Amino acid sequence: MKRGCFFLIMSFAILQLAGCIFFSTSISFSEEIFWNKVDEGLFVGEFDSPLKSKINDSKVTIVKINPKFYSFRLLCASEHSRARITAKKWCEKHNLIAAINAGMYQADGIKNVGFMRNFSHLNNPRLNDSYKAILAFNPVDPAVPEIQIIDLRCQDFEKLRLKYHTLIQNIRMISCRQENVWSQQDKIWSMAVFGMDKNGDALFIFTEAPYSGHDFINILLSLPISILNAMYLEGGPEASLYFSLKGVEFEKVGIHKTGFEEGPYNAAAWPIPNVIGIIKKPR
């Protein structure tokens, strides 16, 4: 091979490699532009839904939490004076940075619909056969992830339940295979959702704009958030998310109406019996 041709080929190869490196770097950093860093390991993002709702602004609000820097807390009215209070009040009373519904509750206004245990306290001792996701945190065993959504169709819960102090059972939305497991429905509503991403970060997810569960799962799978799996927490006016840290404060509340009228619907936050909250770990 002539020397001139050799240098031409090598130059072209180097340019291609540089282009690949640049492209890969662009991909790896592309998600960061959607997140506002509030503190180390703590981000807030507001995403435009690709599916527009006829009610409200079609925004999806997400708090991303790195469990390396934050601890998770389950607070239950059954363990704290049996008093239901708003997510904001739960935060103020227990020094939480953020709080979201821990799940749907029964007619008594206190007990979770699915199994719920927090250390020695049992809010609901019975597993719900219809609910296939269990949020687990406060590990007993340092070998397991600090927080995870256990998929009852994919994982051995009987072994894993012994490895965590806190367990919260709810409805599975995104499976361990990243599949939408909800069928389509006509009903639409606001939603609070808990997710985990592929980096092991926890996601507090909220949409005030109402969607069917099936459609909202597809929205989450389409967003640039690297979502791994997700479980349903609450819907309608009971759905709540509160956040306050370093001058960033917001309170998200589900709306009462689920029709197709245009216009904003500003609802007051409902008192709720059970929340998942976060606090910063000591250095």
Predicted regions and their residues:
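N-terminal Sec-pathway targeting helices
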Residues: 2-9
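Hydrophobic membrane-insertion alpha-helices, especially the h-region
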Residues: 11-16
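Zymogen propeptides
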Residues: 26-128, 205
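Short, surface-exposed beta-strand/loop "edge" segments at domain boundaries and coil↔beta transitions
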Residues: 54, 69-72, 82-83, 142-145, ...
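Solvent-exposed coil/turn segments that connect beta secondary-structure elements
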Residues: 68, 104, 199, 279-281
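Active-site beta-strand/loop microenvironment that shapes enzyme catalytic pockets
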Residues: 94-95, 121-279
